[in-house]
Amino acid sequence: MTSLERTDAERLVEMLVVGFGGLAAGVIASVLLGVVLGPLGVPLDDLAVGLVLSVVGLAIGFVATAIAYLRYRNLPLSSLRLERPTLLDLGWVVAGTLVLLGIALALGVLVELLPVSEPSEHQVFEIAEDRPEILLLMIPMSLLFVGPGEEVLFRGVIQTRLVEFYGDAVGIVVTSVVFAVAHLPAYAGEGVGISIAILFSLSIVIGWLYERTDNLVVPALVHGIYNAVLFATVYVTLTTDLF
């Protein structure tokens, strides 16, 4: 094995450590939030409270890991490519969100037609079957914490570095693999592989949007809005007879 190959392997491992390190940091942050807020009378045994702490903690962990990595590598915050969105950027946000929704719908139909297990449900949707109001809470949480937090780490740091190392195509694909696998703890059941494959497909689009627009705000908004639309749709499905 050549020195260059070893260097490439080390770079890949480094990004894997950053990705899963961010996930671990998020879990730790969630626990610490509980430790701090519990004595203040916050009902930690309430599912809604636990969900909020988990979402906020993960976002804190992702952003903290991203900043720590940038400092470790002496990289400027500008390397995240975080810019004020232009009208064109907002157009990409709308288009990107519609594409994600279309892909999710198409893949859902395809899975129903094929002799495979149905996709596993995200744990939030499982909780919502008994407490659908939680989905209303997740709409702003997706926009404020889930989309921005995950995109800062996975696109702003991991994809940016992998694209720098290996080029756009490889960088986007490898980042999408890490992104999808990092969501494994949120799923369970026979169809978990299908769910991860769908997440991978959606992540490819988000990653492409980041490189196309060169602005982290675009994938953060697309990610957050897409999730928010899903939560709103499932809420309507659970609480009305419209679907």
Residue ranges and their predicted role:
Residues 1-98, 105-113, 228-243:
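N-terminal, membrane-interfacial amphipathic/helix-forming hydrophobic leader that caps
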Residues 5-13, 17, 44, 48-52, ...:
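Structural motif marking the loop-to-transmembrane transition
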Residues 112-132:
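Membrane-interface interhelical connector segments
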Residues 78-81, 121-124, 190:
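Short, hydrophobic secondary-structure boundary micro-motifs
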Residues 102, 130-243:
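Transmembrane helix-loop-helix hairpins at the membrane interface
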Residues 84-91, 118-123, 185, 198, ...:
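Extracytoplasmic/periplasmic mature domains of Sec-exported, cell-envelope-associated bacterial proteins
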